[in-house]
Each structure stands twice: as structure tokens, then as C-alpha cells.
Amino acid sequence: MSEKKEIATFAGGCFWCMVKPFDEQPGIEKVVSGYTGGHTENPTYEEVCSETTGHREAVQITFHPDVFPYEKLLELFWQQIDPTDAGGQFADRGSSYRAAIFYHNDKQKELAEASKQRLAESGIFKDPIVTDILKAEPFYEAEGYHQHFYKKNPAHYQRYRTGSGRAGFISEHWGAK
């Protein structure tokens, strides 16, 4: 595997549901659940959920771009969220659950904007694509019990993913992709 590594950061609602899709891909070194985009250093889960820190739940992905390029990460990201929802994601409401792409350099920004435009023009969604594209800010790793939740609590994870409406939405809009 290439020694070249890059970082990608995505907010897609509850971070429990954002780890597995990326974790299972070739060229992904690690996926960390955490918080970004806010004004408080080292926030806790409770603080972020209180909607007072400005952070969003997010995942930070260390990847090998020669194996799994950033463009593919973007494509996979769009397939995990409702990009037309400005109030959160699925059952999770509030600013801490709003979707966003946090770019780490100009190339990522350019690719993110182009992918958003392609999605808007694709006709998959009739409503406008409202997912934010923002400059990456400090990322704070979430508490240990949130890391790889889908592996630690598979039944709870599956109930949540289905019960929140995420699984049905993804199936309806993306099929078996």
C-alpha cells in the first residue's frame, strides 16, 4: 500500500452510522468519530448534544488516495446522508447533526464543490442540496464508547440505523450501491 496518506472529514448526522461505510473500504487506514466545527476545545458528547459548542458530530478518515481516492470518498459520503436536510439527519435534529464536508486543502474543496454540483444536477433529489462545504477546523476525538460503535454494539447499531430512517432512505435513493 502506498505510504501517501490524506485526511478527510465528513459530518453526516450521528457518527455511529458514518463509520462502517468507510471502514469497510480498501485503502482506509482508520475512521475516527469526533466533533468539529465549533468554538469549544475538547468538547464532550453531552456538550455537543446541548447545541452550545457549535460542533457537529463527524468522522475523520485517514486514507491512501492511490487506493481509494478522495472522489470515491465523496461519492460514498453522499450515499450515506440526506443532502437536502438542513435541520439535521433523519431522526437526529439540530445543528450538531447537520451534514457537511470539511475540506483540508484547496483540491478537496474543489472536488467537494464539483461533486455537490453533480449531485444537484443528477435529478436524484428534487429538493436543493444544502450540505455545507466548510474549511476543516480542529477535530476532537469522541469518547471511546462511540468509536466503532457498529462493531461493539451490532444489534443496537442496526436498530438505530433502521429506526432512524437512514437505512430506508439510502435504500430508496441509492438501491444496492
Curated annotation (Swiss-Prot):
Q: Which InterPro entries match?
A: Met_Sox_Rdtase_MsrA_dom, Met_Sox_Rdtase_MsrA_sf
Task: Give GO terms for biological process.
Answer: cellular response to oxidative stress; protein modification process
List, in alphabetical order, the Gene Ontology terms for molecular function in this entry: L-methionine-(S)-S-oxide reductase activity; peptide-methionine (S)-S-oxide reductase activity
Residues folding into a coiled coil are none
Q: Could you name the active-site residues?
A: C14
Indicate the secretion signal residues.
none
Which reaction equation describes what this protein catalyses? L-methionyl-[protein] + [thioredoxin]-disulfide + H2O = L-methionyl-(S)-S-oxide-[protein] + [thioredoxin]-dithiol; [thioredoxin]-disulfide + L-methionine + H2O = L-methionine (S)-S-oxide + [thioredoxin]-dithiol
Q: What is its EC number?
A: 1.8.4.11
Broad EC category = oxidoreductase
Give an example GO cellular component term for this record. cytoplasm
Carries keyword Oxidoreductase? yes
Q: What Pfam family does this protein match (any one)?
A: PMSR
Q: Which UniProt keywords apply?
A: Oxidoreductase
Question: What highest taxon heads this organism's lineage?
Answer: Bacteria
* HAMAP family assigned to the protein according to its UniProt record, in alphabetical order: MsrA
Q: Give the similarity note.
A: Belongs to the MsrA Met sulfoxide reductase family.
What is the stated purpose of this protein?
A: Has an important function as a repair enzyme for proteins that have been inactivated by oxidation. Catalyzes the reversible oxidation-reduction of methionine sulfoxide in proteins to methionine. May deal with oxidative damage to alpha/beta-type SASP in spores.
Q: What is this protein called?
A: Peptide methionine sulfoxide reductase MsrA
**Native source species:** Bacillus subtilis (strain 168)
